[in-house]
């Protein structure tokens, strides 16, 4: 089923969206590597685009909060408290990665939004 395939190692790569980690921290707080923000955004969007539309919201959720795989491995939860950049601020932005202003990618909801993650950063 769709739900069971949206796990790391199946429709979602292991530790998905690692490029998005730095894009999110740079975009929300101006902290992170000294790469051009547009290049970081392009890398993040490419990683997100490579994930099937029906799993993109789950991949963003894993980036935000992590997951324990069926084999017991902890994956994701790449957003961490950074000096001057609290994790909650990054979590509030992460669901916006699929929106028109950011990567503009369709999801399981049929458009560029993750209904299941709205308000997740609050």
Swiss-Prot record:
Matches recorded under SUPFAM superfamilies: Bifunctional inhibitor/lipid-transfer protein/seed storage 2S albumin
According to the UniProt entry, the coiled-coil residues are none
Q: CDD domains, alphabetically? A: AAI_SS
**Sorted alphabetically, which InterPro entries does this protein's record hold?**
Allergen/soft/tryp_amyl_inhib, Allergen/tryp_amyl_inhib_CS, Bifun_inhib/LTP/seed_sf, Bifunc_inhib/LTP/seed_store
Where found? Answer: Secreted
- Superkingdom in the source lineage: Eukaryota
Read off the lineage from the record: Eukaryota, Viridiplantae, Streptophyta, Embryophyta, Tracheophyta
Naturally occurring in which organism (per UniProt): Eleusine coracana (Indian finger millet)
Q: Name one Pfam family in it.
A: Tryp_alpha_amyl
Name the family.
Answer: Belongs to the protease inhibitor I6 (cereal trypsin/alpha-amylase inhibitor) family.
An annotated GO cellular component of this protein is: extracellular region
This chain belongs to the protein called Alpha-amylase/trypsin inhibitor
Single GO molecular-function term?
serine-type endopeptidase inhibitor activity
Tissue and organ expression note: Seeds.
Between which residues do disulfide bridges form? 6-55, 20-44, 29-85, 45-103, 57-114
Q: What is its main location?
A: secreted
The entry's function note states: May play a protective role against endo- and exogenous hydrolytic activities in the Ragi seeds.
The UniProt keyword set, sorted, is: Alpha-amylase inhibitor, Disulfide bond, Protease inhibitor, Secreted, Serine protease inhibitor
Gene3D superfamilies, A to Z = Plant lipid-transfer and hydrophobic proteins
